[in-house]
């Protein structure tokens, strides 16, 4: 790495509140404003399930593969009994229409705290769908007590 410039660029749809000295770009991960293979690593941890529709998830995956020479994309598994977004067991298996702020207030650990609205907007992704989104990439299943906890995509 001698003689090479290194840095971290954070891409987020929300405006920055504290960049912590990192490069910050406010943009959609479904339409990244960088040329092909601009980054050594495109990294995403538990974000792809928050971009909305399946179409947006495919765009997100495509953009990661386009701008990153290498990729690392992690997303939680809906099959795991505890939803990391709600910090509660089994609720994410209920119909989405039930997951109102009023309902979550009484049935989740974090419900007693103020929650940002985007935390309710989760579109779960199966391992099979990840394989379609990231062709040619390796998908690893993280397990806890034999149950699939999350999926990680790498190339």
Sequence positions of predicted segments:
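Conserved SAM-binding loop
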Residues: 1-80, 155
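Short alpha-helix
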Residues: 114-138
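Short hydrophobic/aromatic beta-strand or adjacent loop that forms the aromatic wall/cage
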Residues: 122, 146-152
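Conserved S-adenosyl-L-methionine
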Residues: 136-147
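Short, glycine-/aromatic-enriched active-site segment of Class I SAM-dependent methyltransferases
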Residues: 86-89, 104-118
């Amino acid at each position: 790495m001698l003689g090479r410039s290194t840095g971290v660029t954070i891409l987020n749809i929300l405006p920055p509140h504290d960049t912590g000295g990192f490069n910050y770009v406010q943009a959609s991960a479904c339409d990244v404003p960088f040329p092909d293979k601009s980054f050594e690593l495109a990294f995403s941890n538990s974000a792809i399930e928050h971009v909305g529709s399946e179409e947006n998830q495919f765009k997100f995956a495509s953009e990661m593969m386009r701008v990153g020479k290498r990729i690392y994309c992690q997303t939680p598994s809906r099959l795991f009994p505890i939803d990391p977004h709600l910090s509660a067991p089994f609720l994410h298996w209920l119909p989405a229409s039930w997951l109102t702020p009023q309902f979550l207030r009484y049935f989740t650990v974090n419900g007693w705290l103020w929650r940002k609205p985007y935390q309710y907007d989760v579109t779960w992704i199966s391992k099979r769908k990840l394989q379609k989104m990231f062709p040619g990439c390796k998908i690893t299943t993280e397990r806890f007590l034999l149950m699939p906890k999350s999926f990680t995509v790498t190339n």
